[in-house]
Structure formats: structure tokens, C-alpha cells
From Swiss-Prot:
Protein name as it appears in the record: Putative uncharacterized transmembrane protein DDB_G0281321
Bilayer topology: Multi-pass membrane protein
Cellular component terms per the entry's GO annotation: membrane
Sequence intervals crossing the membrane: 6-26, 35-55
Organism: Dictyostelium discoideum (Social amoeba)
Keywords from the UniProt entry: Membrane, Transmembrane, Transmembrane helix
Length: 173
């Protein structure tokens, strides 16, 4: 929550409500109580509208941005979506398709973690093995994050990216 909203909410909760309750208990039907009650109603409507505006405006901008990306890259068989955790996700059919058709900032792949019967983590499968394993799935997804971020999969993925990346993009990496 932005700092100005937290200040306004604090004023409403810790100043206006207690003053109004105090006036209701000790000064029935006073003009001060009426003034504070009207001010409280107007102030609450104002806070509610600002909170709703702050909550939904960024989401609307993100949705508009995703629609523009989908229109621009629709001929490359990739699409952008928001998942349940409200992360922007890029969907594409196969790993080879990703390296040839996805624009530069969308570089980092998160492949699923594979576990054997002993519950030990394994390295993600490279290229063709991963393709064969994913044949039953229509799409593979990646997070909308720059390549700079590191994770446990960064080493094998960077080597895979170097295989498919043109020379001019390697210099930028």
C-alpha cells in the first residue's frame, strides 16, 4: 500500500473513529458529532475509491500490455498470460521454438524439477530428451524475468542458450 494511503487509513481508524465514538457516548446530538459523522462518511468514500483505484489500475495496465504483446507476436506461435500467482508467463510450443522465435528479454526458462525414487533432485533434461518427455504437453511455460536473475537451473540453461543464440545477442549477454 502506498504511504499516503496508509497515512489516510491511519487517520480514519485512530483519530476519526475514536472521536466519533467518544462524542456519541458523551455528547448526544451535538453539532460536532454530526460534523464528524458527515466527515467520516465522505472521508471513507474517498479512501474506498482511492484504494479501489490503486488496486485495479496497475492490473489493467498489465493486461493491456499483455494484449499488445499477444497482438505483436501472434505470428510466432507464442503467447503471454497471467497465471494464478499473478506472474506474467510466456507460453510456447517447444524449447527449440523458444530460442528461434521469442524476443530478447524473455530469456529464462524454468524447467520442471524432476525427482527419482530416492527424492534426489536431478538436472533438467537438455534439448531433445526434454522435448520427448514433453510430447504429451501442448505448451511449456517460462516466467517473465530477465536473464540476469540466477537460480539453480542457470548453468545448463545458459549453455543451451549459447547454442541457439545469434552472435550479436551473445555479445549483449
Amino acid at each position: 500500500m502506498p504511504y499516503y494511503l496508509s497515512i489516510l487509513n491511519s487517520i480514519a481508524l485512530f483519530l476519526i473513529f475514536p472521536i466519533n465514538i467518544f462524542l456519541f457516548i458523551f455528547h448526544h446530538n451535538s453539532w460536532i458529532q454530526t460534523f464528524f459523522l458527515l466527515f467520516l462518511i465522505v472521508f471513507s468514500i474517498f479512501l474506498f475509491s482511492i484504494n479501489i483505484f490503486e488496486l485495479y489500475l496497475p492490473k489493467k495496465r498489465i493486461i493491456t500490455f499483455i494484449e499488445e504483446l499477444n497482438n505483436e507476436y501472434s505470428n510466432r506461435l507464442i503467447s503471454f498470460h497471467i497465471n494464478q500467482e499473478e506472474d506474467i508467463v510466456l507460453l510456447y510450443p517447444l524449447p527449440d521454438h523458444f530460442y528461434k522465435n521469442v524476443p530478447f528479454p524473455f530469456f529464462q526458462i524454468h524447467q520442471p524439477i524432476q525427482q527419482d525414487q530416492n527424492q534426489q533432485l536431478q538436472e533438467p533434461l537438455p534439448g531433445k530428451q526434454y522435448q520427448e518427455q514433453q510430447k504429451h504437453e501442448t505448451y511449456t511455460s517460462i516466467d517473465f524475468q530477465p536473464i540476469i536473475e540466477t537460480n539453480q537451473y542457470s548453468e545448463p540453461l545458459l549453455s543451451e542458450i549459447e547454442e541457439y543464440t545469434p552472435i550479436d545477442l551473445k555479445e549483449q549477454i
